[in-house]
Amino acid sequence: MDNELDNLISLLQKSKASLKEKHGDRIRSIFAAHHSGSILPKEDKSLYDKCLATVDLLDEVQQMLTPPLHTLIDGFFGFINSKTLLCAVEFGIPDALSQGPKSIEQLASSSPQGELSPHRLTQVLRTLTGIGIFNYDKTSKLYSNNATSDLITTAHWSKWVYWTKFYPTEFYDMMRFLPDHIKANASRTAAQSNYNTDMEFYEYLSNSGLAKEFHRVLGAGATAQLPGMISDFPWDTLGDETVLDLGTGSGEFLFQLLENYPRMRGAFMDIPSTISRIQAECEQPGGRFSGVRDRVAGFHAGNFLDEVPASVVYTIKWCLHNWSDEDTIKILQNIRRAIVVKPEARLLIIESVLEDGRTGRPARYGDIIMMATCNGKERDIENWQAVCEQSGWEVVKSWALRNSIPSCLELRPI
């Protein structure tokens, strides 16, 4: 075993040095090459996937070699990462560093929230630099942003900064009630217990005034992940078919597809109030979606649990994880009955696919969040295949999407 570990240490040291010195700029470009609404470079996809495969393999090795107590300690104190990240954003550290490297004294004295303790701020930033958020140069004793902390500046187009302010607060409080929720006789979700209500989660958001902030956070995440969604499935193979987006929400996803694929046509379906807003954005001069109005084939107000309009191609994004398997099968059956069967016919589900490994963590986090809020869930590929087969569909491929938590499941009618 000594020789194995010596060889592994030597190999990792050499690989780390080579990647940093010879390929550092290339690695940074692979992860930085995404902008709002833009198509990602196709030539980067293979390297991106290899990076993630390497991360998963290294994570397996790390788990083998990590003392069990160290693993438990990460479980005991995982909340510290969330709360120190919240502190950094609340006190404007990423924004301050966007102007250039700074000392701890400069950061402590320039916070928009008032002067901070340099010593205590050092403790917070030591935790964050240790997990790859921010850089610290021991020689100059200066902090700087890195590719990760750049994402949480207020000026960054992705607005991931909204997530750092919402999840470590609202959802942090909610998770205190997770043990009660797991009990077989639980009558309330963790969210209902946290807010002391019997209202469903989304109903409570609307009635409490939290809905606006919640949808701002989710909307930011959706926008941030759009480049991978519109780049890593071959949408151009759909030609001039009409894509009907079910549960369209903000409408931004379909709008970006139409913007980037000029032969494509699209249609929206959601509840009446959402469709009214989207239709106005399409038809009013200067509206957000007015530039693609000539390729919008319809605005459909309704409930996909009842029925859906006929179409050759459907998309549904971040909806089915809210529903039980029984309701999901009902929705998929409605789409199967309505689809116009021809060679191009398909349903594209953009949802998380539960997987093991380091890169599977985001979906596993999402699975707990869906349970805690609305008794929903994410699904592994076997679960997806089961609900799809029971409703008349075959999952022909799961497409991995860059810089995105979900995958794109391609379904064909059977």
Curated annotation (Swiss-Prot):
GO biological process, one term: methylation
Cited Pfam families: Dimerisation, Methyltransf_2
Annotated metabolic or biological route of this protein: Mycotoxin biosynthesis
EC primary class: transferase
SUPFAM superfamilies xref list: S-adenosyl-L-methionine-dependent methyltransferases (SSF53335), Winged helix' DNA-binding domain (SSF46785)
Active-site residues (renumbered): H321 (proton acceptor)
Keywords, sorted A to Z: Methyltransferase, S-adenosyl-L-methionine, Transferase, Virulence
Annotated positions binding S-adenosyl-L-methionine: D270
MF-aspect GO terms: O-methyltransferase activity; protein dimerization activity
EC number: 2.1.1.-
Stated family: Belongs to the class I-like SAM-binding methyltransferase superfamily. Cation-independent O-methyltransferase family. COMT subfamily.
Function according to Swiss-Prot or TrEMBL: O-methyltransferase; part of the gene cluster that mediates the biosynthesis of sirodesmin PL, an epipolythiodioxopiperazine (ETP) characterized by a disulfide bridged cyclic dipeptide and that acts as a phytotoxin which is involved in the blackleg didease of canola. SirD catalyzes the O-prenylation of L-tyrosine (L-Tyr) in the presence of dimethylallyl diphosphate (DMAPP) to yield 4-O-dimethylallyl-L-Tyr, and therefore represents probably the first pathway-specific enzyme in the biosynthesis of sirodesmin PL.
Designated name of the protein: O-methyltransferase sirM
Species per Swiss-Prot/TrEMBL record: Leptosphaeria maculans (Blackleg fungus)
